[in-house]
From Swiss-Prot:
The protein, known as: Shikimate kinase 2
Enzyme class (EC, first level): transferase
GO molecular function, one term: shikimate kinase activity
InterPro entries, sorted: P-loop_NTPase, Shikimate/glucono_kinase, Shikimate_kinase/TSH1, Shikimate_kinase_2, Shikimate_kinase_CS
Recorded name of the encoding gene: aroL
EC number per UniProt: 2.7.1.71
Function, in words: Catalyzes the specific phosphorylation of the 3-hydroxyl group of shikimic acid using ATP as a cosubstrate.
Predominant cellular place of this UniProt entry's protein: cytoplasm
Organism lineage: Bacteria, Pseudomonadati, Pseudomonadota, Gammaproteobacteria, Enterobacterales
Notes concerning its domains: The LID domain closes over the active site upon ATP binding.
Length: 174
């Protein structure tokens, strides 16, 4: 049985894009926890946050993580999935965790170009570049703590996929 692969990292690091390509390369299924949650609740992330607040959203996010976990699956998680220790431990115990690491300026540029940005409420209400600096400062240590592998996500999606496949192969060989 092949363990699930969890992709973690800040918004805009490429978890969904890389995850879909990685799943294809490995012959795995793909799931995005935010998309799963939105389909299950028939609400956008922004709607869930508006109705239940961030704490309610984080609780639903944790439920989604457990619901989608299965063997031979690549799972793109929400950027804040690592905030709860329960989620970090769950991912480490049930699969391989890959941190897609990118700097704040790259993330901000990607988010500003992303057409569905209105579905992702800002955490601080400030411009996206400022927010990404603050979010990364607060979360980078948590991403590193949760990760089995840290991958440079400032490359092309294909290069990121190749680096992940190599890292996973090296881990299996050791």
């Amino acid at each position: 049985m092949s363990l699930p692969i969890y992709l973690i990292g800040a918004r805009g690091c490429g978890k969904t894009t890389v995850g879909q390509a990685l799943a294809l390369a490995l012959g795995y299924d793909f799931c995005d926890t935010d998309h799963y949650l939105q389909q299950a609740r028939q609400q956008t992330v922004a709607d869930i946050v508006a109705i239940e607040g961030w704490a309610g959203f984080r609780a639903r996010e944790a439920e989604s993580l457990k619901a989608v976990t299965a063997a031979s699956k690549v799972i793109a998680t929400g950027g804040g999935m690592v905030l709860a220790e329960e989620n970090r431990l769950y991912m480490r115990e049930h699969g391989r965790v890959i941190y897609l690491n990118a700097n704040a300026l790259v993330l901000a540029a990607r988010l500003e170009a992303y057409p569905l940005a209105d579905q992702r409420p800002t955490l601080t209400g400030r411009p996206v570049a400022e927010e990404m600096v603050e979010v990364l400062a607060a979360r980078d240590a948590l991403y590193q703590l949760a990760a089995h592998h840290i991958i440079d996500a400032m490359q092309t999606p294909d290069a990121v996929v190749n680096q992940i496949v190599s890292s996973l192969s090296l881990a299996r060989a050791s």
